[in-house]
């Protein structure tokens, strides 16, 4: 095991690395939060800073450590502290959830400072119960460091619906308050996260969600070009007048993930039954406009594996497609 003195040296050196890179005008810095790594007699701080995620793929982390750490400062070979940095991020992101109060909403935040991607998802209490699992799944396949914000909504049907509509399931109608929700995101959530987590001004923002939150993400991207991408898993594209609205005011982002369960359109609800035809049409229209868009069919109905389906949506939206 590394002596306490050596652990302190490592922490100081990693802090020095972060400081140096924050003054690098050409590359953004990101850092994995502190976490003690136990295993194989090794105990070091996993506070490793380096340049953008691409650096993790070409060995920059190893190069940085080799320049800053000296064998005399360690009681074990230097190779033992050259860790798989992408794995570090995957492990750390799932255990670093924190609550940040933004306005009147307690937002749950995961991920890294100075991240290249900011992922936003409107959630209800039920989804929050599986959020750790969803974010861990995103991190497992992510090629880029990201900051993830789960933003709670109290009235799902009201806060995420773009306009008023009668109830289609049960007795709860739709209040049409999506404009207020979008204003809260753009004027409070995003600025707060950028400042608090040192996100670059040009951070790529992906708005995503499941069901009505997926529709909200699609609708929001008709109102602003702020979003780099949309991750819409099983979106409620059956919503009355949505397809006509999108034709008149098209989605502005160029990166759109769409998915649907292969049993979702097999419903006796005549309003919701159009979801399959609508999502096929929307996908075709977006492709015809030249958008980077995919439509994935998942096995099962609407309530199967919502967390994993949404994770796949965010993963795709962060990938580079040619």
Where do the protein language model's features map onto the residues?
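Serine-hydrolase catalytic machinery in alpha/beta-hydrolase-like enzymes
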Residues: 116-198
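The feature captures the conserved acid-bearing segment of alpha/beta-hydrolase catalytic domains
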Residues: 237-305, 317
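A domain-start/cap signature at the N-terminus of enzymes
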Residues: 22, 75-117, 146
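Short glycine-enriched nucleophile-adjacent loop
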Residues: 214-223
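Gly/Ala-rich beta-loop-alpha elbow adjacent to hydrolase catalytic centers
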Residues: 208-209, 213
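Short, charge-rich patches within N-terminal targeting peptides
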Residues: 54-63
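A conserved short beta-strand
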Residues: 226-237
């Amino acid at each position: 095991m590394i002596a306490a003195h050596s652990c302190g040296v490592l922490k100081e050196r990693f802090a020095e690395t972060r400081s140096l890179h924050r003054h690098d005008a050409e590359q953004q810095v990101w850092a994995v939060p502190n976490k003690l790594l136990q295993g194989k007699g090794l105990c070091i701080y996993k506070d490793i800073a380096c340049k953008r995620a691409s650096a993790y793929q070409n060995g920059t982390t190893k190069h940085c450590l080799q320049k800053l750490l000296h064998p005399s400062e360690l009681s074990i070979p230097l190779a033992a502290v050259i860790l798989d940095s992408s794995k570090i991020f995957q492990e750390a992101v799932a255990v670093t959830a924190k609550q940040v109060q933004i306005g009147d909403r307690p937002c749950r935040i995961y991920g890294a400072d100075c991240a290249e991607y900011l992922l936003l998802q409107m959630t209800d209490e039920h989804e929050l119960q599986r959020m750790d699992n969803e974010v861990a799944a995103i991190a497992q396949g992510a090629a880029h460091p990201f900051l993830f914000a789960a933003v709670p909504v109290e009235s799902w049907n009201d806060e995420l619906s773009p306009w008023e509509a009668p109830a289609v399931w049960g007795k709860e109608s739709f209040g049409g308050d999506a404009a207020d929700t979008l204003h809260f995101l753009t004027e409070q959530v995003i600025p707060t996260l950028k400042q608090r987590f040192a996100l670059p001004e040009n951070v790529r923002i992906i708005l995503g969600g499941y069901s009505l939150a997926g529709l909200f993400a699609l609708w929001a991207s008709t109102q602003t070009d702020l979003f780099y991408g949309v991750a819409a898993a099983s979106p409620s594209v059956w919503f009355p007048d949505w397809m006509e609205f999108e034709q008149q005011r098209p989605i502005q982002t160029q990166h759109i993930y769409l998915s649907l369960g292969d049993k979702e359109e097999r419903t006796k609800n005549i309003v919701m039954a159009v979801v399959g035809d609508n999502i096929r049409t929307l996908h075709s229209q977006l492709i015809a406009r030249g958008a980077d868009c995919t439509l994935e069919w998942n096995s099962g109905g609407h309530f199967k594996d919502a967390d994993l389906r949404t994770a796949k949506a965010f993963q795709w939206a962060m990938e580079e497609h040619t």
